[in-house]
């Protein structure tokens, strides 16, 4: 994506797909995290090599099931987790070589990796740049030690203190940070102090999202046992609604509820999820969507390596799913193209009728088949999306 002053209008794209790879190990399991991940301390994972072999095996099996993938082109690869920066760079390199040998790959292939602060270093970024990784996202969440302790996150003070210095001197230009707000015990001003510290560095991508309480996490058990409290919803709504204007002043485009980018620096991979493009999900706990079918892998690394059924798929249900993803976008998109491509006639009529009602209420603009939310829709978003699918 080139930097441009014109806003990108998202549209249906038919000849590409993305690859997501889940590396399930972390230094420590955070209390609020509901991704499949296991805390294993500072050392490497015992099964790292066999896990990478299983990734290749899974890709091959899924391609045998969907041979048409060979006619598409991979334009995004995303190493997520867990903490993929915990894995050896050479293993990512071999995996990328494998993909290049098996598939058509776009010339401007986006290759992203999530990095945790404890792994970040100038040397690591050099290594990544050498193997073609061209996008790095660091899960910071907060720089406040009290907040990190509340979240049960590993905190390496030296690394947290030097991370902006490292990122602003990165050989990889497309770098971003995740920050979280609404952490109990922290004030609104704590979040803004983190944000302004990071804004000064001018990184091209920021994900700013609220803490949520997910079932099955340590955090949810602690809330149930009255050891911790729920996320601060009032603070969250206040920050959520203030952010678009503030970020715009700093030159960022608000392209998804929680995501801001300098022009041309949007995450092409994450846009696939919101624009209903196909992707292979590889690794334990990963999900994929290919040729109108979804699948999910076992949330257990050894079970995944022993036996992952690669012939079990559920058909997608675009009449309801499309709204859940597409209408999270706050940048403009060609809504008529999307609904004509994915929905049956009666759902198309329902979508169009509802969108016109939203326009009358001043919640969105529509023109020449292009849809864009207005800020007024933000706090109502969940209900609005629900209203289009029921
Ligand atoms: S580091 Fe990330 S993936 Fe790992 S437990 Fe924490 S939030 Fe989850």
Which positions does each model-derived feature cover?
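Short amphipathic alpha-helical interaction segments
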Residues: 345-359
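N-terminal [4Fe-4S]-dependent radical SAM core
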Residues: 1-20, 69-72, 380, 386
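A short, conserved structural fragment
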Residues: 359-369
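Local cysteine-cluster metal-coordination motifs and their immediate loop/turn environment
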Residues: 22-37
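C-terminal scaffold of the Radical SAM
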Residues: 9, 14-16, 35-65, 73-345
């Amino acid at each position: 994506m080139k930097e441009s002053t014109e806003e990108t209008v998202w549209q249906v794209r038919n000849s590409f797909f993305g690859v997501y790879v889940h590396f399930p190990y972390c230094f420590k399991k955070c209390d609020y995290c509901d991704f499949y991940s296991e805390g294993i301390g500072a050392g490497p994972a015992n099964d790292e090599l066999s896990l990478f072999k299983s990734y290749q095996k899974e890709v091959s099996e899924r391609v045998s099931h969907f041979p048409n993938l060979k006619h598409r082109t991979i334009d995004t690869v995303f190493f997520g987790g867990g903490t993929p920066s915990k894995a050896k760079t050479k293993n990512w390199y071999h995996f990328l070589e494998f993909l290049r040998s098996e598939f058509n790959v776009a010339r401007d292939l986006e290759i992203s990796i999530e990095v945790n602060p404890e792994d970040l270093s100038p040397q690591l970024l050099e290594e990544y740049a050498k193997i073609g990784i061209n996008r790095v996202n660091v899960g910071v969440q907060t720089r406040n030690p009290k907040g990190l302790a509340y979240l049960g996150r590993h905190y390496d003070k030296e690394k947290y203190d030097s991370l902006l210095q490292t990122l602003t001197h990165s050989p990889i230009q497309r770098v971003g940070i995740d920050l979280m707000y609404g952490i109990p015990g922290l004030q609104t001003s704590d979040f803004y102090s983190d944000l302004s510290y990071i804004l000064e560095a001018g990184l091209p991508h920021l994900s700013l999202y609220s803490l949520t309480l997910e079932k099955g996490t340590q955090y949810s058990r602690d809330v149930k046992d009255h050891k911790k409290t729920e996320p601060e919803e009032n603070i969250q709504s206040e920050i959520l609604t203030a952010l678009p204007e503030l970020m715009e002043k700093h030159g960022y485009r608000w392209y998804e509820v929680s995501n801001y980018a300098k022009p041309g620096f949007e995450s092409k991979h994450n846009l696939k999820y919101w624009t209903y493009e196909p992707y292979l999900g590889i690794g334990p706990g990963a999900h994929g969507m290919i040729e109108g079918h979804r699948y999910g892998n076992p949330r257990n690394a050894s079970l995944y390596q022993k036996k992952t059924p690669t012939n079990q798929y559920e058909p997608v249900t675009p009449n309801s799913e499309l709204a859940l993803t597409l209408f999270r976008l706050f940048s403009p998109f060609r809504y008529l193209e999307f609904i004509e491509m994915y929905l049956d006639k009666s759902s198309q009529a329902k979508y169009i009728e509802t969108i016109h009602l939203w326009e009358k209420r001043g919640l969105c603009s529509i023109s020449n088949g292009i849809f864009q939310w207005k800020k007024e829709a933000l706090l109502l978003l969940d209900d609005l999306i629900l209203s289009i699918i029921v």
